[in-house]
Amino acid sequence: MAVNLSRNGPALLEAYQQVVNEKSSTDWALFTYEGNSNDIRVAGTGEGGLEEMVEELNSGKVMYAFCRVKDPNSGLPKFVLINWTGEGVNDVRKGACANHVSTMAGFLKGAHVTINARAEEDVEPECIMQKVARASGANYTFHKESSRFQDTGPQAPVGSVYQKTNAVSEIKRVGKDSFWAKAEKEEENRRLEEKRRAEEERQQLEQERRERELREAALREQRYQEQGGEAGLQRKYEQHEVLSRNREEQPAHPREIFKQKERAMSTTSISSPQPGKLKSPFLQKQLTQPDTPISRESPHATSRPRADLREEPVPSIPPCSVQVEEEAVYEEPPEQETFYEEPPAVQQQDASSEPIDHYPGLSGKGLCARALYDYQAADETEISFDPENLITGIEVIDEGWWRGYGPDGHFGMFPANYVELIE
């Protein structure tokens, strides 16, 4: 809240005017607050100067003193405003009263010196008068008569202040100045030269570093190109080894094994033992005709047509007889020929006929399979099963992964080489 000067306004103004009036004997007035309010009242006035006023200051209150003193330099009256905040005042009251200082300075206007005091050391009369003397400016006195003129006899002639210019000293002084100017210039040039050399060395080191990096990069590129072929072959070999190990670790499907054997045997039977020789369709037909009786007859019966073939003269194509003998020598045993010459459809029908008898309740459930190994699902999109479990409703989505309903009815993916189809 703002300070209240209107409640006790006439008394405050009267005390202030008594101090300002030079004809009045009152030379100080003291103001303070009424209790804890912001109303200002007159705490006291006096004619005893600073010594008397200092005795009235209370260490537990916030007070404002306005004094009239005489300037020790000029002898003119000066006014001093003292903002007193006692050491016993609490911090809240100090903060509230700090905003009133400017208002009180406006009311007690005309002060030449303003002092903010908190302890008795700040309001000692000697200290206050020193501040007044410093604030008055030049040390001079008024209304003091100077000593009267006294005749002391003839005065000596006034001497000239002219001094002849000394060329030597002037040259020395100028030379000294030029010497120091030259020294400063040389020092500045030396610093600039050192800075320039340091910059050149830095640029040279940077250039050498870049060239070294370029050379090293070129060498690395050259070594990489030289070793590129060997590294590529090595990588291909390692990849092939990894694929081979993975293929060996994965269990093979029985049907795949059977197909691989069938393809291998068919390739062996079709391939020619001696490439480059011509085959006669007529002789090949003669060899394929007795296949059926060969599988039923004894070895003696089989050797009889071979002897007939060798005795029959073939003058027109003599090389073909040699080829016939060689083909006859490399023929597979009759049992193996009979086994692999049977139609695949008949074998599949025979192989699939047995599981159908063992699983009669799978009709209408789509493509079904029997688990050969146990498998645990890696996530919720896969199914788990144990050996001999049945998987129904299979969808062939990939060569290595199928989808179907597991034993628990959950639909998900599973590896194709872990099951065997039931047809």
UniProtKB/Swiss-Prot annotation:
Residues modified to Phosphothreonine: 26, 288
UniProt region (Disordered), positions on chain: 185-204, 240-318
N6-acetyllysine modifications at: 176, 285
Entry membrane topology: Peripheral membrane protein
A cellular-component GO term for this protein: ruffle
Domain SH3: 364-423
Modified residues (Phosphoserine): 160, 266, 269, 272, 280
Molecular function as annotated in GO: actin filament binding
Annotated ADF-H domain residues: 2-133
Major localisation: cytoplasm
Cited Gene3D superfamilies: Severin, SH3 Domains
Entry keywords, A to Z: Acetylation, Actin-binding, Adaptive immunity, Cell junction, Cell membrane, Cell projection, Coiled coil, Cytoplasm, Cytoplasmic vesicle, Cytoskeleton, Endocytosis, Endosome, Golgi apparatus, Immunity, Membrane, Phosphoprotein, SH3 domain, Synapse, Transport
Biased composition (Basic and acidic residues): 240-264
Keyword match Protease: no
Localization (cell): Cytoplasm, Cytoskeleton; Cell projection, Lamellipodium; Cell projection, Ruffle; Cytoplasm, Cell cortex
Coiled-coil annotated spans: 180-227
Phosphotyrosine modified-residue sites: 330, 340
Swiss-Prot/TrEMBL GO biological process terms: adaptive immune response; endocytosis; neuron projection morphogenesis; podosome assembly; positive regulation of axon extension; positive regulation of dendritic spine morphogenesis; postsynaptic actin cytoskeleton organization; regulation of actin filament polymerization
Superkingdom of the source species: Eukaryota
Biased composition (Polar residues): 265-274, 283-292
InterPro entries (UniProt xref): ADF-H (IPR002108), ADF-H/Gelsolin-like_dom_sf (IPR029006), Drebrin-like_SH3 (IPR035717), SH3-like_dom_sf (IPR036028), SH3_domain (IPR001452)
Site, as annotated: Cleavage: 357-358
Domain notes: The SH3 domain mediates interaction with SHANK2, SHANK3 and PRAM1.
Function: Adapter protein that binds F-actin and DNM1, and thereby plays a role in receptor-mediated endocytosis. Plays a role in the reorganization of the actin cytoskeleton, formation of cell projections, such as neurites, in neuron morphogenesis and synapse formation via its interaction with WASL and COBL. Does not bind G-actin and promote actin polymerization by itself. Required for the formation of organized podosome rosettes. May act as a common effector of antigen receptor-signaling pathways in leukocytes.
Subunit structure: Interacts with SHANK2, SHANK3, SYN1 and PRAM1. Interacts with FGD1, DNM1 and MAP4K1. Interacts with ANKRD54. Interacts with COBL. Interacts with WASL and WIPF1.
Name of the featured protein: Drebrin-like protein
Organism: Bos taurus (Bovine)
